[in-house]
Amino acid sequence: MKDKGKLVIWPAYIDQTRSRSNGRIISRKNAVKEPHLNEIKDAAKNLGLNPEVEPEKAYPKSWWEVSGRVLVDDRGPKSVIAKQISLEIRKKRGKGVPAKT
């Protein structure tokens, strides 16, 4: 990877419509439906993660779909950062944060 200190966040990581075997890395209750690159970028910016958007990239598992990716600062485990980004998108969409059980 050319950018040290960065994590790659693919939209598939937080997409509620995808299965774990197709790329989702967080739970369905914390994921969002069909996240867009701009939503991920805005959420990462709100979290202070210095996002860089690469719209021409394709997720390797579905190489025929050019979904793009977002590079963010590496400030912890990828799953934790993906969950924070997803919850930030949910807040912005007005869905709210899921209740803790």
Swiss-Prot record:
Protein localization: Cytoplasm
Protein name, entry field: Signal recognition particle 19 kDa protein
Domain of life of the native organism: Archaea
UniProtKB keywords: Cytoplasm, Ribonucleoprotein, RNA-binding, Signal recognition particle
BP-aspect Gene Ontology terms: SRP-dependent cotranslational protein targeting to membrane, signal sequence recognition
A GO cellular component annotation in the UniProt record: signal recognition particle
Record has Cytoplasm as a keyword: yes
PANTHER family: SIGNAL RECOGNITION PARTICLE 19 KD PROTEIN, SIGNAL RECOGNITION PARTICLE 19 KDA PROTEIN
Subunit details: Part of the signal recognition particle protein translocation system, which is composed of SRP and FtsY. Archaeal SRP consists of a 7S RNA molecule of 300 nucleotides and two protein subunits: SRP54 and SRP19.
Species of provenance: Methanosarcina acetivorans (strain ATCC 35395 / DSM 2834 / JCM 12185 / C2A)
Listed InterPro entries: Signal_recog_particle_SRP19, SRP19-like_sf, SRP19_arc-type
Primary localisation category: cytoplasm
Keyword RNA-binding found: yes
GO molecular function: 7S RNA binding
NCBIfam families: PRK00754.1
